[in-house]
């Protein structure tokens, strides 16, 4: 029984250390790890880091940057990648339509 408890305790410690060491994977706390104070063009990791609430990965191998949300007629991406950022484009800004076939369109 003592061996089992030791194994469970060690497993929990290793699990916690693994989660703490990898901030790319997992859920982001509400409000993000930092306040949304980054301007468009500044590097970000998650949407919550940006004043615009949109962090975009434009190309693989390039850093994510803050960007404006899309306006009517502009390219958009309604989906979000796990971890809290967008691929290629931001979603539509409030009042600028719905992202249909990757373009913000008023309905």
From Swiss-Prot:
GO cellular component: extracellular region
Cleavable signal peptide: 1-21
Keyword Membrane found: no
GO-annotated molecular function: enzyme activator activity; toxin activity
Claim: Signal is one of the keywords in the record: yes
Posttranslational mods: Contains 5 disulfide bonds.
Compartments, as annotated in UniProt: Secreted
Principal place of residence: secreted
PROSITE patterns, sorted: COLIPASE_2
Tissues/organs with expression: Expressed by the venom gland.
A biological process from GO: digestion
Keyword list, A-Z: Disulfide bond, Secreted, Signal, Toxin
Family per similarity comment: Belongs to the scoloptoxin-18 family.
Protein name: U-scoloptoxin(18)-Er1a
Organism listed in the record: Ethmostigmus rubripes (Giant centipede)
